[in-house]
Amino acid sequence: MAIYWIVSYSILVFCFFELAMINQASEAKTKILINYFFLIGVFALILFAGIRGPDSGMDDSQYVGFFHDFSRQTGMTGYQAVANIYRYENFFMVLAWVASCFTHESYFFLLFISFIAVSTNAWVYKKYSPLILCSLCLYSAHLFINKDMNQIRFGLCSAFAIAFICSLVARNYLLALLFIVLSTQSHSTGYTIVMIIPFFFIRERKYLPLVLVIASIPLGIIGGKKLFLDSLGIVPVLGERAASYSGTNFDTTSPVFGLANLKNIAFIGAFTLYYFRKGIMKEDRFVYILLIAYSIGAAVRITFSDFSIFGGRVGNLFLHTEPLLFAFLMLRIRNLLLNFFMLFSITTYYLAYNTILSAQSIMGYSVAPLFRIFS
């Protein structure tokens, strides 16, 4: 597991330079250096996830086996006949078909998916984050490990979902439409991203994000599964998929006041009180929507504490806004030592959580035999 710490801490070193130059960020030389470090980090993450081998991600064997069979079956019976056999979403199946036109090697397929997922997240950070290296560092310590190193369909779904939210706030509606289609057709959880849409039409309220997450606590104590599972059927595909987990080994509970939930509540409260201490200005709308999305994720996670496979999956879709939120928060603080301490602390927390305290996504790390140059 040490390799994950090395990767994230390596990016963290570059973050110190970005934070130190926060007041000179608009200068050409500073931009060039930061972009150069950013590209190195993105390339490293793509390769790190793309060349992984056995005993890395928990779900890897599922996708390696899938592509091994799929790439050979399509050559004999055609795409449509084979696609009907599998339960995977349309866009993911199309990606598998495109990859199968060039190779039958499953580990090349993982590299292909890694390139798309990491590049999409990188595009979002490059376009919308004020501190791109800091966002990339947080992503590498948590979302990258949880999603792109394991749940690759959900990783694609989440990357497209955050791109959808950002594009919608920027009023790039055609791009937003493209991203929501790609998200829902990468993983059925993507349909839940529509929960953010009503908040585009509701007047900004300073404490609304905090109200959302606090209101979810009594629902979580009662149990979201008991209250809402039957209603999930109104969501295409997702309701059926969620119901299929009920009563299985995936149907587990998590504490309402667990470490992750308490961290989310504390972050929402602290962010609200500090970032919006003078109220929500017109230029704060983008950050406000990101915080609303984060609050929805935290609230869903708490509400469905009695059905953690659903609460965790849907919650994590919205919690994908965290690397952007932290970047905006540090930009407003503008204190080098405090910012670096915050970034170091949250990066360390996530690395410890994902590799030691709750290693649910990864088993370790190895390089696939296909990519072992020196063995």
Swiss-Prot record:
Q: Where in the cell is it found?
A: Cell membrane
Per the record, the major location class is membrane
According to its UniProt entry, the protein's GO biological process terms are: polysaccharide biosynthetic process
One GO cellular component term: plasma membrane
Role summary: Involved in the biosynthesis of amylovoran which functions as a virulence factor.
**Keyword entries, A-Z:** Cell membrane, Exopolysaccharide synthesis, Membrane, Transmembrane, Transmembrane helix, Virulence
Name of the molecule in the record? Amylovoran biosynthesis protein AmsC
Any stretches that span the bilayer, and where are they?
2-22, 31-51, 93-113, 162-182, 208-228, 256-276, 287-307, 309-329, 337-357
**Origin: domain of life:** Bacteria
Q: What organism is listed for this UniProt entry?
A: Erwinia amylovora
What is the membrane topology here? Multi-pass membrane protein
Pfam families for this protein: EpsG (PF14897)
Q: In which pathway does it act?
A: Glycan metabolism; exopolysaccharide biosynthesis
